[in-house]
Amino acid sequence: FAERMSRVQSLERFIHVGTAMSCAPGPNTLVTESELDSQREQHVVEYTWSKATIEKKMTECLPNLPLVIARPSIVVGHSEQGCLPSASIFWVFLMVFTLRKFTCELQDHVDVIPVDYCADALIRLLSAEGVLHEVIHISAGTDSSVTFAEIYEALAKATGEQTLISDYQKVSYKQLAESQKSFKNIFGPCNERVMLRAMSLYGHFSGLNVIFDNAKLLKIGASKPAKFTDYLDRCVTSTRGVTIAELMQIDFK
């Protein structure tokens, strides 16, 4: 499709939506829009590697394509409607909160944006001046990223559960695996093996403690996104009565 569009002379801009994780970032970093040169062994999952591969292929093979690569960070919920448009990924935070333990530190940051902010940013990229052959993060950045401690406290407030930050424990994946048989008691009916696989996958990403720099996006006039903790209560309200196992099916069909 991209090859065909590169031959359309009237085409002014071609937006490819990838993922911020396609650069395979190192831990504890502020990640700027990097070169398209990551290697397969740097990627934990095929998804991010495939995104990185197509970005590089379009850039190298289609020089006439008016390409802009947009890299959203973690898209969770809607700033006004909560999880009504999509509950993707939100269940991960509920899972951690319910367990009271996970493989990340409470002070680790996570770069989350609402889906409406992501959509508005993509529309802005279609017409922004001076944006061509660029890689641009759509992300929370330094000012709007939040820590897991802040998320934990916001979930406690939104759910009305009496729990303290001190209740949380950082554990290893091995320790999570050892508690696999208790998952049904904690989460209700669920596929314990799928649940554990999800913990392994998202545990890796959550432990990276990375923030994706959004200076480029702000420079073309985008506003700062709402913090995840500012609309998290709406995500809780819109998923009330739905089990974590049911929410997982959005991402693990």
Task: Give each language-model segment a name.
Residues A2-E12, E60-P66, A128-G130, A158-T163:
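Secondary-structure transition/capping motifs at alpha-helix termini
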Residues F1, S50-M58, V92:
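Conserved catalytic Lys-bearing alpha helix of Rossmann-like short-chain dehydrogenase/reductases
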Residues I15-G18, L62, R71-S73, S139:
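Active-site beta-alpha turn of Rossmann-fold NAD(P)-dependent dehydrogenases/reductases
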Residues F1-E46, V68, G77:
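Conserved Rossmann-fold NAD(P)-dependent oxidoreductase catalytic core, especially the SDR/UDP-sugar
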Residues L201-A215:
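Active-site loop of classical SDR/Rossmann-like NAD(P)-dependent oxidoreductases
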Residues E33, R40-A52, D108-V112, S145:
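Short-chain dehydrogenase/reductase
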Residues T29-L30, T59-D111, V115-A128, A154-A158:
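NAD(P)-dependent short-chain dehydrogenase/reductase
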Residues R124-S200, K219, C235, V242-F252:
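Mid/C-terminal beta-alpha module of Rossmann-like enzyme folds, strongest
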